[in-house]
Amino acid sequence: MIALGCDHGGFVLMREIIKCLDERNLPYKNFGTFSEDSCDYPAIAEPISRAVAAGEFEKGILICGTGIGMSIAANKIPGIRAALCSDSFSAEMARQHNDANILVLGARVIGTGLALYILDTFLKTPFEGGRHARRVAMLGDLENCR
């Protein structure tokens, strides 16, 4: 199951992503926001990131204007490996090599078509494991240094 959320800057793109998920019969929970009214991205990123980190959701998708704020906020939560992706190769590598568990998109940076292509790549690409598993474990060790 996918946890999905956006701030006001990502609302229009999130509606398109919801259509895509519905067409594919992919289960998700929409954490909001539910309008284009201004809201604070950390308030959206935190519950989604905590739910993904707790294992309640397999993956998450966060959307804001640039993706930067959501990415920073999500990566504050231990266990989260949020990747801001503006191309499909980055999404593929984020999954294959970094076991990214949250995809972050910048709605004002990329168009809908590219966003859906990135989403497809992120969702279908498995984690490669092997030497990359060791590196992901090292990221977890860094979280414990706080």
Model-identified regions with their sequence ranges:
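C-terminal binding/interaction regions
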Residues: 3-5, 9-10, 88-146
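Structural motif
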Residues: 37-46
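A short beta-strand-loop structural module common to alpha/beta enzyme folds
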Residues: 27-38
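Helix-adjacent hinge/juxtasegments
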Residues: 47-84
